[in-house]
Amino acid sequence: MHKAKNCIITCIDFRLQKAYADFIASQGWLGESDLISVAGCSRDLVKPLSDFHKASLLRQIELSIKLHDPDTIIFLDHQDCGGYAQDGTIPQGLELDEDKKQHTAYANKVKKLIHDLFPTREVKVYFAQLEGKVEEL
């Protein structure tokens, strides 16, 4: 088995690709982690539009665990996320503090869900600002 440090889930939003890449590299995770990219990042687990979306993302995480045994499952959510906004879950255009506050509430839900499903894995959720700053929630 090839061992990965992490399974990292990001949003597909092109505006954050550089911030994600820079952050992943700064943590020493580049080339050491499985990468999954879906619209809304953690949203499909905490407020899926359909059961398919949740099952699909969980399947990718399960495959990462089965194939590469990552120690940590990491979600990189972000400010002004269209994936979260598609049904108004977290509206776009919020002030940064309010956006981060709402993401924090969902981050706590995704941490619990992943911990319950995969209790031997550490779970972390980060929040990327549009200008590139990334912080743990």
List where the protein language model places each region.
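Acidic/histidine-rich, metal-coordinating catalytic segments
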Residues: H78
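A short beta-strand-loop structural module common to alpha/beta enzyme folds
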Residues: G31-C41
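Short, solvent-exposed amphipathic alpha-helical segments in soluble enzyme
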Residues: D22-W29
